[in-house]
Amino acid sequence: MRRINVDNIRDNLFGPINMSLICKKLGVHYTYLGTGCIFEYDNKHPYGEEVNGFTEESKPNFIGSSYSIVKGFTDQLLHNFEDSVLNLRIRMPITDENNPRNFITKITNYEKICSIPNSMTVLPDFYPIIVDLMERRKTGTLNLTNPGLISHNQILEMFREIVNPDFKWKNFSVEEQNQILAGKRSNNFMDTSKLEKMYPQISRIEDSVRKMLLNYK
């Protein structure tokens, strides 16, 4: 039986929903930085292909970790506040800073890499977009990932090319990864059609990652 993580439920479910209720009551616009790590590839969403991505209306289908289960419930509940809450789904956030929260820094410090094509979010691309959405009091759900897919190996190959030519890494399978992790990892392709209609200037993920690596420090 899976142990209930009280902090997870408090921080990722009760907190956001209570904030949504309070802001709705007071007429205050609320922007919530949620996650797209509530989906996984399946028969309708083929592995590693940029087709039939998960849309803003898609229901969570990933239950591989307690974090994603709780976040999935929160995401669906926020659809009840579409007139007052902006729910932004981000994934695997990337910046040009060498810090432990940066996805690039994380994977360059892993002993082994399970390389899977994924949708990801290059945060500096979205800072002005988030501010614009807040200023215009936009509401509803929006997939906030750069268009396209990129794998861990593609990022590490660029890292070796641009940052450290001596960098090396080893790969292992999803099955091997699952044996050593407490929870499974979400892997998916997010549909960004809605985002691209609103902000057609947004860069594809591989171009933005390369830009981050050129400034990585």
Feature locations, PLM:
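Non-catalytic, hydrophobic alpha-helical segments
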Residues: F126, I130, L144, I155, ...
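A short helix->loop->beta-strand "cap" motif at the edges of active sites that frequently abuts
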Residues: K25-H29
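A short C-terminal helix-loop "cap" of Rossmann-like NAD(P)-dependent dehydrogenase/epimerase domains
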Residues: T55-E57, R91, I104-C114, N164-E175
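Residue-level signal for the nucleotide or nucleotide-sugar donor/cofactor binding architecture
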Residues: D11, N118-T121, I150, M190, ...
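Amphipathic terminal alpha-helices
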Residues: S203-K217
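NAD(P)-dependent short-chain dehydrogenase/reductase
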Residues: Q76-P128, D132
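Mid/C-terminal beta-alpha module of Rossmann-like enzyme folds, strongest
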Residues: D132-N187, K211
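Catalytic helix-loop patch of NAD(P)-dependent Rossmann-fold dehydrogenases
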Residues: R3-N18, C37-L88, T95
